């Protein structure tokens, strides 16, 4: 009989993917199979290891027990295959997450499990809106309720709820907001009680609607508030005026499309989100490591080593057999991000040009090398690195090695157009991304006209103009930070 696997019921937190716990991240990285649904940030899946099986079982809040039973059975099925299974659940597994039902099924089949708590939206979402669920002198307690009905004509005892002191929090209650407010007032709750509806909390799309308990349903409907949303009822809502912090961030409310490859795109998205912006990653490029083809023993033949991108650094050191093979070789780098990648390996570049151009790096390395020195350039298959011309011009022996390939990662035209509808800005950090983007749109760029297009530098701008795409702005320094600075000034 095959050995049973183990299941980790993991709370994925809410909205902001950095609200995932460290233990949750570890479980994800070690999983053979991950079963997830819609109520979580999909970028969390990026922490999974290579070869992980992903199973999406989306569960809208209108669907019933049939879907949950399907999920229960799938978890058991994968565990019985001997796999380490992570069941990812938005928020916390035991706060209206139906985690208990999944565990009952595991227990019936004698499958070992662990529960990893998650940050619940009942607390985190109000916090991001500047609303504390408890506050000295205002609220000594808070009470969390589901805003949905399990069965028709089956709901809460609002008489008891209306009598409670402290803050009332309803999850998944937008659809029943009018009923909730009416029932609370009917059973004695002050109609003037401050009430907040927080939509898409903890994300760059967060929106807060506030009014009295009596008027909140009408106001929310007027403002077209939709789920997912958290409803907070109580005097603590008044604290938002002073405690609101998230919506004051520089990029809050800005919807920004990132077009980089997945690895660098994730980093760029995080920088946007640190500043409160809402980023959407649509990777139009796929990076393919080629450093496994390099003979590191040949490094002893070179006097200098140049890197023109973080990817080149990463792949070079991923395969290096022994750091000592570098010997006394001089190292040059283009760009702050390339330098930062080198510093991860305790290496500081000997030269860095002020302008973030590979041609400038070729000139800079002349200062610390001599005629006829051999200089190795780790680059991509599409990088403008003319080693033959440089060798002739500078009396050095430049040799380039293609450390990685940059391939188009084409998307369907329909998918791209759908995502662009919600965007305000689109960022391009390479000519290749522009070409792949236009290819994906089948050369129909009409959907781009209303967007503010930001270019990283002259080469990318030239490519954008070639395809008749209007540029809103070009970065002053040709880096990802330069693009961020444009967004900050907007």
Short names for language-model regions:
Residues 8, 14-15, 52, 67-71, ...:
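Signature of uroporphyrinogen-III synthase
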Residues 16, 92-95, 99-164, 209, ...:
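Class I SAM-dependent methyltransferase SAM-binding "motif I" and its flanking Rossmann-like core
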